[in-house]
Amino acid sequence: MKILFVEPAIFLSAFAMTLTGPLTTQYVYRRIWEETGNYTFSSDSNISECEKNKSSPIFAFQEEVQKKVSRFNLQMDISGLIPGLVSTFILLSISDHYGRKFPMILSSVGALATSVWLCLLCYFAFPFQLLIASTFIGAFCGNYTTFWGACFAYIVDQCKEHKQKTIRIAIIDFLLGLVTGLTGLSSGYFIRELGFEWSFLIIAVSLAVNLIYILFFLGDPVKECSSQNVTMSCSEGFKNLFYRTYMLFKNASGKRRFLLCLLLFTVITYFFVVIGIAPIFILYELDSPLCWNEVFIGYGSALGSASFLTSFLGIWLFSYCMEDIHMAFIGIFTTMTGMAMTAFASTTLMMFLARVPFLFTIVPFSVLRSMLSKVVRSTEQGTLFACIAFLETLGGVTAVSTFNGIYSATVAWYPGFTFLLSAGLLLLPAISLCVVKCTSWNEGSYELLIQEESSEDASDR
């Protein structure tokens, strides 16, 4: 008997994703550090390889390393842009007919292949530039955005009531927070006690178990398409794919279409800033004046991941006394405050305190997805999440590339500039959400509007 709980797959995937990020960044950082100069990292050092004295030649050297790491991250992100966009859009769109498991399986295969390649790269000390090729190839199978999009669509398929969608998505965020928090907290100890080789191997094993669970134990609430759809040619399949996306907007009334576009803009602009700035935190913490080691970076990652847990608690409590849109406002403005505080953090204590306003960072992601799911029909959920995932893939890669480029250009004169810029950019989703509020957003009214449009379509037939 198949299981209809996607949570175990999310648990394992979140563990692998959270551990892969800081490990890969610090591995590349050390390789570039050692190849750029005659300096080596000490594996048992209790302090970061970092120089705080600006007059020291080591200080200029580490600034050069920061620039090189940032540029390399930029190259990796760009290499996976096009294949990631195509695969994400196609896989999630066809999931409305072929089931949600298909994109989960394919993206899990890609993640597993990439993690195995990381193990080999680290063990045999291959040129780290080969990571660019693995990113390019792995993106064809989909990425974590594809996986999360399929998981969210899987969950929405099982939720009949609108409030249930918000709570269920918030529970997923809680699970993500629990896993990513503990993983982030332990990531530094993984590096220190096990080294990069064994750490990457653990990631590969967890992804293999995840793939086995999805293949053999996870059921799919969405049935396979009819034989007529299966026998469609490839060109007809693509036409049908884009046609469904076009009809998602065309079939909506003017007011609902405007709201749909506005909410998508809000989600993507917020996603652009939050995802784009995320990799910069580690580089910022490695650099002077903080000079954090791998353990402190793990603590910082754990505090950042705690926002999943606190966001779940916030949604659970706030849902009794306020609407989704008000919760989104709270998340945006607290995140903006955290960005501004981080820009001026010059000590370890200040950096930890700057993490506090990020406690509700995940709230807008959950409630905005829930709001979007309420303005489309149940048969359009897969197409909607395909659009979201496609835009998130495009926005995420563009954001990471943009912020890495900005950080590389500004790290020498003011490393915190990127965080100040992020705080300013968060005004865009805040203003967009204000416009949504001015359109008299009401969850019940849009539910009735969708029902009326559906009845009109039925009568036309």
Swiss-Prot record:
A Pfam cross-reference name: MFS_1
Topology, Cytoplasmic side: 95-101, 157-170, 219-261, 316-324, 369-382, 437-461
pH dependence: Optimum pH is 5.
GO CC annotations on file: extracellular exosome; lysosomal membrane
Gene3D superfamilies: MFS general substrate transporter like domains
Residues of this chain annotated as glycosylated in UniProt: N38, N46, N53
Membrane topology of the entry: Multi-pass membrane protein
Spans traversing the lipid bilayer: 74-94, 102-124, 134-156, 171-191, 198-218, 262-282, 295-315, 325-345, 348-368, 383-403, 416-436
InterPro entries: MFS, MFS_trans_sf
Organism: Homo sapiens
Keywords: Glycoprotein, Lysosome, Membrane, Signal, Symport, Transmembrane, Transmembrane helix, Transport
GO biological process assignments: cellular response to 2,3,7,8-tetrachlorodibenzodioxine; vacuolar transmembrane transport
An MF annotation (GO) of this entry: copper ion transmembrane transporter activity
Subcellular location: Lysosome membrane
Family recorded in the similarity comment: Belongs to the major facilitator superfamily. SLC46A family.
Protein name in UniProt: Lysosomal proton-coupled steroid conjugate and bile acid symporter SLC46A3
